[in-house]
Each structure stands twice: as C-alpha cells, then as structure tokens.
Amino acid sequence: MQYPEAIGRLIESFTKLPGIGPKTAVRLAFHVLDMEEDDVLTFAKSLVSAKRDIKYCTVCGHITDIDPCAICKDSHRDETVVCVVQDSRDVIAMEKMREYRGKYHVLHGAISPMEGIGPEDINVSSLLTRLQENESIQEVILATNPNIEGEATSMYLSRLLKPTGIRVTRLAHGLPVGGDLEYADEVTLSRAMEGRREL
C-alpha cells in the first residue's frame, strides 16, 4: 500500500530497529499519529537527546552521560575485580542481580571470524592498558555470551591475560532455574557439571 511520504519515512525508520518488522512498524507509525503532539515531541526529543548526550566511559566503555561513569567513580566498589562483558546491556543485567560489586569492562562486541570481527575490532586494547596501569586489579571475570563468538572471545582473552599473572575466571554456565534436566542440551549439562559447587 502507498502511504503518504511522511508516514512512509516513519515506517521505514521504525523497521531499522531490531525486532521490528514491516507490520509492527506500520502499527507503531499509526500509534504515533494517534498520540498527543506534546507526547510525540517529548519522544522525539528523548531520541535526539539519547543519541547526542550518551557516550562511552573512557575507563570501562559502558554507556554514560558523565565521564568516567558512575560505576567507575564509585569508591565503594571492589577495585580488584573487573568483569568483562560484550555489551552495556550485560552491565545492566549484572547490576540488576545486585550481587557483583566490582568494576566492568565493555568490549562492544565479540570476536567473530565469520563476520570479519577480530580482536582489533573490539575494546581489547583499552582493557590491556587498564590492567597495566592499575596494579590493584587481581581478577578478570570473563562474562561473554555462551555462544561461539563469546567462547572464542573468552578463549582469546584468557590466553592473552594468563601471562600477566592476573587471575582469569569465566562465569559458570548451566541450567536455568525452573528448567528440566531432560530438555537441556549436552553442552549446557556439561557446563553445569563443571560449574558445580559444594553445598
């Protein structure tokens, strides 16, 4: 169907978002038309403001509107542990847990030879610099995703960091709470067995 040009551009803009297909984009566009003008302006300003004002922390690479970020500036956090994650969304997920009190380092991706992404394309060099400059760091927790790219990234970082003498650990992967053993794949079961702990 042919939409007026302004609606067509709005629909096309919505389809650029992850998980938004053409039908959802049309619904969203028409929802915007039904919104109060003040709400639309607030929404538009929020988009522009987020894009303009949010930057990456120069210490850890997490998204922030101040530099360094609030986590890096927090003197109550454990300076001796750095949790390495792929994405700022991973930091947010870890923070929701409210158990980890160390610092973070965001890679902004994972090694993926199939997609042409190597170690030089992610935030590895600043991690090495950070570890060299901060002698108080005693442990690096590798919390990359449990997929091929995340595993490749963890293995690479593990080999790279071992000679530094800093303890390198990997998050345990295993069975989800409420999940049934019979539905778990072999890799998940194997990791759950390896990551078992004393009770």
Curated annotation (Swiss-Prot):
GO molecular function terms noted in the UniProt entry: DNA binding; zinc ion binding
Keywords, in A-Z order: DNA damage, DNA recombination, DNA repair, Metal-binding, Zinc, Zinc-finger
Domain Toprim intervals: 80-176
Zinc finger extent (C4-type): 57-72
Cross-referenced Pfam families: RecR_C, RecR_HhH, RecR_ZnF, Toprim_4
InterPro entries named among the record's database cross-references: DNA_Rcmb_RecR, Rcmb_RecR, Rcmb_RecR_Znf, TOPRIM_dom, TOPRIM_RecR
GO biological process, one term: DNA recombination
Role noted for this protein: May play a role in DNA repair. It seems to be involved in an RecBC-independent recombinational process of DNA repair. It may act with RecF and RecO.
Similarity section: Belongs to the RecR family.
Name of the protein described by the UniProt record: Recombination protein RecR
